[in-house]
Amino acid sequence: MHSRVPSIESIGWLDASLGGTVPWAYVLGNVINPGFLPYSAMCVYILALDFIAPLVTALCMGRFLLRHRYVQDKYMAVLASLLVFAPSMWANAVLFGNQSGIVCCCVILSMCVLEDSETLAGLLLAVAMCKPQVAFVFLFPLLCKKHWKAITVTSGTVLGSWLLAAILTESSPISMLTDIMDQGLSYNTSYYGLFNFLLGFGISTKVVLLLDVAVGGVILLAAAAWMFRKKLDNDWLLWYAVTAVVSVMWFYKQSHDYIILALPAIAIFCLPHISLPAWGSILILLVDVIAFAVPKVCTLLCGLPKDVVSPWAKLLETVAIMATLYYVFQSAKHHAGRLIC
């Protein structure tokens, strides 16, 4: 992606194969990666932010859990909120200076402050839109619950930043977006969502992503319908936990984007109606282990090329993800039924 504005001489043109960013992040991204600072200062800034952001998020999460009585005492609130630090992918994000951890913290914070300030929640979600593959789906619960102010603030901030980026780089706003989409479709180190395994069978990336979006949308709609029917639609932790699970399957991802799964981890810890049966948990764990081990075992012991085996391993991972969703909703359905009775 090139504009008519010359590159910075000390940096030069960047290799497109190293990745890119959405156009509005040229402006909004400076909150996380301040490009106007000297490189050495920026490294210190983002490293500090990688520690401060989850700490602030954990504190706000603890307050949120106590306020809504998800936990009964401060001790349990501390234990639950510390799960923000739990995802091992934090190490990946910090090591490579990736902003995913901070983006995920912004999403979680938007939930924590929503009832106090829709404007602040909208701004936090707008910053998180620097990685729309993580944050975009979180507009869905806001839409379902008619939080128009938060949606307007998020949309307006993103669109305004996009337009400003186009003006500053003297580029077409549309071409800026299509360029990064084309680049993303050829970025082979990414995990392309729920149907990623189809890539190994020769299916094009565009078809895979369309299937991801379609199935992710169906899951969100089904979850929303179920929550409204069971009168669980005021449970914001449940809304965000379900949406977080969908966020890792509906579009392309990299390992550090999975930090958002801290949300369902907290929900499982706190909500009595989201607990997996023991045998179901063991089954899911076994499928995950098998999916991880199959490529290595077949490559080392059987001499099969990893490219041949990986699609089947990804298929097993997909089964594990869907099994997780199934058991979560079955457990929630059972608990909701007991409450109604």
Language model region names:
Residues 125-141, 251-257:
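Transmembrane helices and adjacent periplasmic/lumenal helix-loop junctions
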Residues 106, 218-219, 260-267, 317-330:
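Hydrophobic cores of alpha-helical transmembrane segments in multi-pass inner/ER membrane proteins
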Residues 251-254, 269, 273:
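Hydrophobic alpha-helix feature that most strongly marks membrane-spanning transmembrane helices
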Residues 142, 267-269:
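Interfacial segments of multi-pass membrane proteins
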Residues 271-341:
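Aromatic-enriched
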Residues 51-53, 130-133, 160-164, 283, ...:
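Membrane-embedded alpha-helical segments of transport systems
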Residues 1-120, 142-262, 340-341:
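Primarily membrane-embedded glycan-assembly and transfer machineries that use lipid-linked glycans
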